Amino acid sequence: MANEFIIKTPSGPILKFEKHSDFIDVGRWGNFIVTLQNAPVNGSIKLSDLEPNRWAIFFEEMSKEWRGRQGTKRIESIEGDLIMQASSDSLGHISVRTELRADQGGADSLITGTLVLEAGALESIAKSANSFFGYKSIR
């Protein structure tokens, strides 16, 4: 099982998931540090999730459904501190709008970035996500 999962894009933004030191058990509960590097602004949040496998499923479904998918595929953390919305065009480009939100005592912070991915990279991204989140694909 991998300790980090990184998506790098040719055009800029980088999204990184890392296991937090108090990570419990993959598949049941997980604490992660999620970092969005979108120069010149970078930000990180601690994300706790009861069902971390759902993030791997999001990337796996994206790798299967990019062609012909209508509309936007969306996933959101329980507390809304991480939101990802994926859409595709007819040329095989997948745009994943990513939002990191932190609310510290009423001081709301938001960092956004759009990762533009090539369809050919999606299977590799899905495999990396499966390894990080401990998800066993049915494929």
Per-region residue spans from a language model:
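Intrinsic, low-complexity N-terminal interaction/targeting segments
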Residues: 25-33, 74, 82-107
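Intrinsically disordered, low-complexity regulatory segments enriched in Ser/Thr/Pro
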Residues: 38, 45-47, 94-116
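Short, well-structured hydrophobic secondary-structure segments
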Residues: 29, 33-69
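Surface loops and adjacent helix of pleckstrin homology
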Residues: 20, 48, 60, 87, ...
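Short, highly charged low-complexity linear segments
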Residues: 13-22, 75, 93-97, 115-127
